Structures are given as C-alpha cells and as structure tokens.
C-alpha cells in the first residue's frame, strides 16, 4: 500500500472545454453534464491547460459555495500520460507535512516549523516556512514554488514573468550568509527528472536565481508523483543551471 503524503478526496473525471476569467473552467463530466469549476491556478499553466485534456475535479459538500467543483488535476502527454497537480493551495500543505516527517535530509536538523513568517527589507513579505534548530545552527528561510511547466523531462519555473518571484529571490539573497535561504521547487508531476529556470519566459528570474546560488542560496527541485489517489515524494530532480 502506497504511503501518500496527501490523499485526494473522491474525484470526478471530465474533459476540459474552456478556461476563462482566470478562475473558471468549463468541464464535461463523464455523465455528459457540463459544469463550471473553480480554477485555483490563476497563472497561464503553460503546456498544461490544453482544451480537450482529461481532468479530475473535487466536489465540495458546502452548499453555500457558488462553484461546487474545483479543478485538481490535468493529464498531459509530454512523455507518457502524466497527471499534473494544478491546485496551488496544495503544495504548501504537502511541504509542511513533508517537513514534519523530515523527508528533506538536505535541510539538516530543525525542531520548529513556522509558516508565513514576515521578512524582507520592507517587512511586507512572508516566507512560506521558517525553520529553527539549536542556537548554533542558522535558521532556514524556505520558499515554495509550484512548478508545472515542462519540456520533455525538464521541469521549468516560472512559466510566465513573475515580478513577485523576482522579489522573493532578491529578499532571500539579503538574508545570506547569516541565515540559510532555500528555494524549494514543487514539481507537481511525476515525469520530470531535471529542473532549470524558465529563461525563455523570465530571463530576469533566471539571472537572479543564478546570482542567488552563487551567494549561497540552496535549491531543492523536489519531484512528486501525482495521481488521482494522492501525492507522494520521489526525491530531488537534477538541477540544470
């Protein structure tokens, strides 16, 4: 039996007909019914949101929700048929579970995990996770980036220009070397074995990432197996810089 880090609720298969206004997706269910689902990923989902793709939806039991269905998975065919997780609310939840289980040995020892800690030059940013251990160990500022775009087996981030992502890199650099700064790329599909910055979509981000690595930023490109049953950690992808 597979020990999933995260198990999906019952999912409903369908076909993606239309995606519009960032938050909406029209899906034809197996029954033939067409429903409008909430799309929790407002980005372009480059190479993923192809019309006609097989998708999986979750359904809320809350009668007050305007849209009962949520788009969770899209099947792509870059390599073999592969499920891609598109619910951007899940990566941080799953990373928190993985941190609690100490699944990332590269981070070393830590005793406390805090989420959404204020940091940055202007104190207007929040880092996803702040890890602390003994007084002799440097604290860890860890940022998570959901990664769904791929070319072959190479995962790429970002899939569009991200001034917010650029800001995060600049702020993590200011913390070095007094603390450890870690960028964790959550590769939300199981068919990728390598990771690289998406230079063609955001060359500034790629330049900043390389500068940050030279200053001591640690990069964890984390591979995850994603299925309609659940999500599990597969280990690190090879970093291609």
UniProtKB/Swiss-Prot annotation:
Pfam families: SfsA (PF03749), SfsA_N (PF17746). GO terms for molecular function: DNA binding. InterPro entries: SfsA, SfsA_C, SfsA_N. Belongs to the SfsA family. This is Sugar fermentation stimulation protein homolog. The gene is sfsA.
């Amino acid at each position: 039996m597979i020990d999933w880090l995260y198990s999906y609720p019952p999912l409903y298969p369908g076909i993606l007909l239309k995606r519009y206004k960032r938050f909406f997706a029209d899906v034809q269910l197996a029954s033939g019914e067409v429903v409008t689902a909430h799309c929790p990923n407002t980005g372009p989902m480059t190479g993923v949101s192809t019309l006609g793709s097989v998708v999986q939806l979750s359904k809320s039991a809350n009668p007050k929700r305007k849209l009962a269905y949520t788009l969770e998975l899209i099947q792509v065919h870059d390599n073999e048929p592969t499920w891609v997780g598109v619910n951007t609310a899940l990566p941080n939840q799953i990373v928190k579970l993985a941190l609690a289980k100490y699944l990332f040995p590269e981070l070393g020892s830590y005793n406390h995990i805090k989420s959404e800690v204020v940091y940055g030059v202007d104190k207007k940013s929040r880092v996803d996770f702040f890890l602390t251990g003994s007084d002799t160990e440097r604290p860890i500022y860890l940022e998570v980036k959901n990664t769904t775009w791929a070319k072959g087996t190479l995962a790429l981030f970002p899939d569009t220009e991200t001034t917010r992502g650029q800001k995060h890199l600049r702020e993590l650099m200011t913390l070095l070397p007094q603390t450890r700064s870690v960028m964790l790329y959550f590769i939300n599909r199981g068919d990728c074995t390598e990771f690289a910055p998406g230079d063609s979509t955001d060359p500034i981000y790629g330049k900043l990432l390389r500068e940050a690595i030279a200053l001591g930023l640690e990069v964890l490109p984390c591979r995850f197996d994603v299925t309609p049953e659940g999500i599990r950690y597969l280990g690190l992808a090879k970093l291609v810089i």
